Amino acid sequence: MTSAPPPAKPLLYLDVDGVLNPVCPRPGSGYTRHRLLRSEVLLSSAHGGWLRELSEVYELAWASTWEAWANRCIAPLLGLPDLPWVACGGVNSGAPEGDFAPIMRHAAGRPFAWVDDLIPPRLLRRYADRSDVLLLPVEPGQGLRRRHVDRLLSRPPRAARVSSGPPGPRPSESAPSPRRPG
């Protein structure tokens, strides 16, 4: 007897700016300055360890205007392999609502978590009770913290149970059995 393959890990979509690269972090908060693509980027080595820990439960993916550049510039500094990425830098660049549609398309029905500093409150309300979607906002001045990692690890999104249709009749409600020919 063959067993079914294990279910795929939920996806974890990560923004860079405001999440891994906080806006104006406190001095001495463990961030190192890097000059990348003519911009100054602050990264914490703790994030690399946390993301590797999360990769045991999740399939990581970039959801950032950095797009493929995140693999070239950010991943090596955090000790991460190349990750899949979602195109979030198009026409709606800078509009968080515009980032959500490409994430939904990429997830293609798989459970996922999205960590971003600009998740619209309307989306937070809309998906608050879903077991297959976790939207985790991060304060852009602080970036990703251990409490966010703990939340992601404690209750990862899981596939929603799907009904195979309306329940069938109860045994007492079923049609009588036909008589055997006598």
Language-model-detected regions and their locations in the chain:
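Alpha-helical substrate-recognition element adjacent to the catalytic core
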Residues: T2-G94
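C-terminal cap/substrate-recognition subdomain and adjoining C-terminal extension
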Residues: N71-G182
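N-terminal intrinsically disordered, low-complexity tails enriched in polar/charged
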Residues: M1-L11, P171-R180
